[in-house]
Amino acid sequence: MSSVDAAWLGMEDPTNLMMVTGVLMLDGKADIKRLRVLLDKRLAPFGRFHQRVVRPRTRGSQPHWQDETRFNIDNHVSHIALPAPGDDRALRELVSELMSTPLDTTKPLWHVHLIDGYGGGSVVLARIHHSIADGIALVRVMLSLTDATPTARPARLRGDKTTSAGLLDWLPAAVGRGIAVGERLLDNPGKVADYARLGAEGAFRLGRLIALPPDPKTVFKGELGRRKRAVWSSPLPLDDFKLIGKAFGATVNDVLVATATGALRRYLEKRKEPTAGVSIRASVPVNLRPLDQAHKLGNSFGLVFLTLPIGLVDPVRRLRSIKKEMDDLKRSPEALVAYGVLNLMGMAPVEVEKLGLRFFGSKATAVLTNVPGPREPLYLAGRKLESVMFWVPQSGRLGLGISILSYAGGVMLGVATDEGLVADPEKIVEAFGQEFRALRAVAAKKAKPASKTSSRLARSVTW
């Protein structure tokens, strides 16, 4: 096991489980037998899904992966029914419960649940430990289960490995755009070697990270409990986010992050919490994996701290402030420095690692990720994939996770919170929609009268 993978394994805590949780909602009832066969066949190329973690018996030794000689797919697939009335609230409760439940550490660290009774369709919920891979790899794994058509057969990838034809069409472009909001910050993962030579700049950035003051105390920070809450929005039109970006010379990423920041401000205001002059930081993943290694599992990403200017009242000023911050981070080797810190933490004794987590965790309030997903609808086990949402773990002592995902022309927001800190994350989701509509209204006033070229202009905006 690599030192960075070991670092994520060591972050596991009963109050903050290191799982990536994904929810895929289907337009009809899926067949459990077909799903098991699909999982068994398409996860087979990823050997890590057939390996369990063996923890060291001697102090100072690294954990390692060991093949599960008696691997049985049935140990990793559950078929359950959603409690009545089978609505969004019932699904949110179930997702929250499973997100709060640890994986079985005696087996490979992943599990898939087929949930029936959600309206007229099924839901596939996947829980995968972060030590297996980072977000870019795990999104690839989850979408490798999908197809471009209801009856598509698996396409060949790298010799005898199989994956989805729908995924093959989408993955290279997604990796090129950057699979997460931070991963867009590093325009070319191949720059890793160039940045690695910038020793002086790296030392400066490390000093900057160490010198950052702790994030201010807000309702989003505090002692964590074991119960988490997971919620998500309905899809919002991606083209509208593009038009907002066009109006203010910003990328879609800039607009999405600004909208999320405005939602947090609105939430604090409704709780009568102070916002004047308040800025918080989000820990943002940055992809460091070269494009020709996008198929590999493992953790190959760094983290940057992105300032979210909650205290700015004007939504346009917030957007411009975030754009400037993200533009600055694009030219920074901060993600590589953070990757190096994670590498060292993974090699350190557990006590030292936990001290490091506590130290760096105090400097942020949230984890923020944004995945530009497939632009066309996909199918899973013969059923159309209506919507997708995921949540990454909140590393260290963070209790707020913000996930943004685009799929088939829509954008959804997912929020995961510690129930003891924020028991009503659905209010943040509502505020996201309100902030989006406010930005859209301002952009409409600024834009020229609508023309036939508006949709073309929207498509021209970059991530």
Give residue ranges: language-model regions.
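Soluble acyl-CoA-dependent acyltransferase catalytic core bearing the H(X)4D motif
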Residues: 1-4, 11-14, 19-398, 402-463
